[in-house]
Design a protein with these regions (language model features):
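Extracytoplasmic gate region of multi-pass secondary transporters
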Residues: 32-37, 157, 220-288, 374-379
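Symmetry-related core transmembrane helices of the 12-TM Major Facilitator Superfamily/SLC fold
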Residues: 175-195, 397-416
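Glycine-rich segments within core transmembrane alpha-helices of 12-TM secondary carriers
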Residues: 137-158, 361-375
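Flexible cytoplasmic inter-helical loops of multi-pass small-molecule transporters
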Residues: 198-216, 423-433
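C-terminal transmembrane helical hairpin of 12-TM major facilitator-type secondary transporters
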Residues: 235-244, 267-343
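Central cavity-lining transmembrane alpha-helices of secondary-active solute carriers
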Residues: 55-70, 274-286
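Intracellular juxtamembrane helix-capping segments at the cytosolic ends
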Residues: 39, 120-134, 141-142, 338-351
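C-terminal ends and interior cores of transmembrane alpha-helices
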Residues: 86-100, 306-319
Length: 446
């Protein structure tokens, strides 16, 4: 499939809608918690078991983004979006078959493994292209697209709940819901495949963008720098703290207020998931755009520092007030989404646009790690507390304390980030070989 090069006069503002059509679709992953209670009931699963498809999906997202990042740079966004469409939709179809036959392993394989590959390739497919179209506003550009991933659950959560109400929450009803998801998202993602274009001067394999200013670092060199691994820690900590709540959102708010005079219904819990998705989406465009004004390091100070404060409030006072619980959770998820949307621009600031898509793909292995850690911490702690006879907010107290600690670790890592040493830079066309050799011989500094 040849790269879709933009014709003369093509408006760059037509590219974000193409990215949104893909990201809004694959963002359904954030609505997985709506399927957890029906699956647990229909297939007799624990909370930890019902999280497996989501966890594996996030693992595969990071791995496929890491190993496929360079290929996406070479083949272009249309090829990547096509692969994402096939894998993501096929994952739902396999899951439908697994639900209909009562074979949970097929749901884990379909949604988690096959669909997870679609998540990873689809997630990174427009990022490098958008940065090349909008070199003047990288935070805003990536925020527009990546907010679709956060907003996907805003659509999918109530839609999935409505389908389960209509089809039923037994094996057959869940299978029909998965089937409709797979077919619908295939059509919607096809819009992105048709619409996406790359700049004429930034074709994959054409040597990068038309104008590349500042340091330019290859993907191979980037992973050898302390800056890459510090950002990896920052992203891992921020994502772990957010994804644990997001994956457990519906049962968590139900448990927190189960013993009150106004317990939370299943419909209200699904609405809470939708609100979190709205905050996730708003944070991606709002905070990433703000980062263009105040800088990436400063915005991550907000994500990590204020995020720890929000978790502390939920831990100490969350069960005393629904508005406080919801408000703190919304702020946390806005930081979570903003962290994702801002990191491509942070990478661009540190490593340039030369292979920023491939570098971004490698960094998303942090998401894979967090996708296991976050749900594992929250679900495992909740399961153990339940076995000990505890209930309500006591199921989550230890998890909240752990999340606070993780955010503090991320805050420290962000403070240690410094500009990349010149010895890692790709020599420009006018750089003498001797100067490039001298740069490589200089000692590393943080």
């Amino acid at each position: 499939m040849s790269p879709p090069v933009a014709p003369p006069g093509w408006s760059r503002w037509l590219v974000p809608p193409a990215a949104l059509s893909v990201h809004l679709s694959i963002g359904q992953a954030y609505a997985w918690s709506v399927f957890k209670p029906p699956l647990e009931s229909a297939l007799d699963l624990s909370g930890t078991q019902s999280a497996l498809p989501f966890q594996l999906g996030i693992v595969m997202l990071g791995l496929s983004a890491a190993f496929g990042g360079t290929l996406v740079e070479r083949r272009g966004p249309r090829w990547a979006m096509t692969v994402a469409l096939i894998c993501f939709s096929s994952g739902f179809l396999l899951s439908a078959l697994g639900a209909a036959t009562g074979q949970y392993w097929l749901i884990v394989f379909g949604y988690g493994f096959v669909g997870g590959i679609g998540l990873g390739i689809g997630y990174i497919s427009p990022v490098s292209t958008l940065i090349k179209w909008f070199p003047d506003r990288p935070g805003m550009a990536t925020g527009i697209a990546i907010m679709g991933f956060g907003g996907g659950a805003l659509i999918a959560s109530p839609w999935s709940a409505q389908m389960l109400d209509s089809f039923g929450t037994d094996n057959t009803g869940i299978a029909y819901a998965f089937l409709v998801h797979g077919l619908t998202y295939a059509v919607f993602m096809l819009l992105g495949v048709v619409l996406v274009r790359v700049p004429r001067t930034a074709r994959p394999g054409a040597g990068g963008p038309a104008v590349a200013t500042g340091p330019q670092v290859s993907a191979r060199s980037a992973v050898r720098t302390p800056q890459f691994w510090l950002l990896w820690i920052v992203l891992t900590m921020n994502v772990t703290a957010g994804i644990g709540i997001l994956e457990k959102a519906a049962p968590m708010i139900t448990d927190f207020f189960a013993d009150t005079s106004t317990p939370v219904s299943a419909t209200a819990a699904a609405g809470f998931v939708a609100l979190l998705s709205a905050a996730n989406m708003a944070g991606r465009i709002g905070w990433s755009t703000t980062s263009d004004l105040i800088g990436r390091k400063n915005i991550y100070r907000v994500y990590l520092g204020a995020g720890a404060l929000m978790y502390a409030l939920i831990w100490l006072l969350g069960d005393s007030s629904k508005p406080l619980f919801v408000l703190c959770a919304l702020v946390i998820l806005s930081f979570y989404g903003g962290g994702f949307a801002t990191v491509p621009a942070y990478l661009k600031d540190l490593f340039g646009t030369y292979e920023v898509g491939a570098i971004h793909g490698r960094l998303l292995t942090a998401w894979s790690t967090a996708g296991v850690l976050g749900p594992l911490i929250v679900n495992r702690v909740a399961d153990h507390q339940e076995e000990a006879g505890r209930h309500g907010p006591f199921l989550y107290g230890l998890s909240l304390v752990i999340m606070i600690g993780l955010l503090v670790v991320g805050f420290v890592a962000n403070e240690l980030v410094r500009p990349v040493h010149p010895r890692h830079h790709v020599p420009g066309p006018g750089t003498p070989k001797e100067a490039a050799d001298d740069r490589r011989e200089q000692p590393e500094s943080a």
